[in-house]
């Protein structure tokens, strides 16, 4: 029995010596700054300065009068048919499910059910038919947009990309606005 205890203690002692032999040297600090080149080119470019004071003069304020906000990038010009097609192809390429929604009264952001600021603004859009599960052709989605435009010419229509694995909406953009907006 004593032999058994001795041999296990000896095995532990030899195991620690092997571990200590393969240890990495401890951190000794940073190298001396004298080994790095000191000459620097003076940068006079205004965009590299930490302050944005020089850029303030070229900024413009978004005019809020008669400029309703629809979605995140609603300040951009309307998408052309080709741009819509490319957006839907991007949506499909990422494996998201295209859905169409429309709103007949308030296509822009407003507060109705909740008065706090933030993402939730009280809008509920009506879904056009069912989500297009299994859709692989962007032209099918645009054909549905055309059908929705014929049925509701005075409605806002948006396309949503829904990730059915993560259960989240990944993309949303306005595909059609009524005349005058």
UniProtKB/Swiss-Prot annotation:
Leader peptide range in chain numbering: none
Matching Pfam families: RbcS (PF12338), RuBisCO_small (PF00101)
Keywords assigned by UniProt, alphabetized: Calvin cycle, Carbon dioxide fixation, Chloroplast, Photorespiration, Photosynthesis, Plastid, Transit peptide
Transit peptide region: 1-57
One Gene Ontology term from the biological process aspect of the record: reductive pentose-phosphate cycle
Main location: plastid
Alphabetized GO MF terms: ribulose-bisphosphate carboxylase activity
Record SUPFAM superfamilies: RuBisCO, small subunit
Location of the protein in the cell: Plastid, Chloroplast
Cellular component per GO, a single term: chloroplast
Keyword Lipid biosynthesis part of the UniProt annotation: no
Subunit structure: Heterohexadecamer of 8 large and 8 small subunits.
Family: Belongs to the RuBisCO small chain family.
Family matches, as PANTHER family: RIBULOSE BISPHOSPHATE CARBOXYLASE SMALL CHAIN 1, CHLOROPLASTIC (PTHR31262), RIBULOSE BISPHOSPHATE CARBOXYLASE SMALL SUBUNIT 1A, CHLOROPLASTIC-RELATED (PTHR31262:SF10)
Further remark: The basic functional RuBisCO is composed of a large chain homodimer in a 'head-to-tail' conformation. In form I RuBisCO this homodimer is arranged in a barrel-like tetramer with the small subunits forming a tetrameric 'cap' on each end of the 'barrel'.
Function, in words: RuBisCO catalyzes two reactions: the carboxylation of D-ribulose 1,5-bisphosphate, the primary event in carbon dioxide fixation, as well as the oxidative fragmentation of the pentose substrate. Both reactions occur simultaneously and in competition at the same active site. Although the small subunit is not catalytic it is essential for maximal activity.
Full protein name: Ribulose bisphosphate carboxylase small subunit, chloroplastic 2
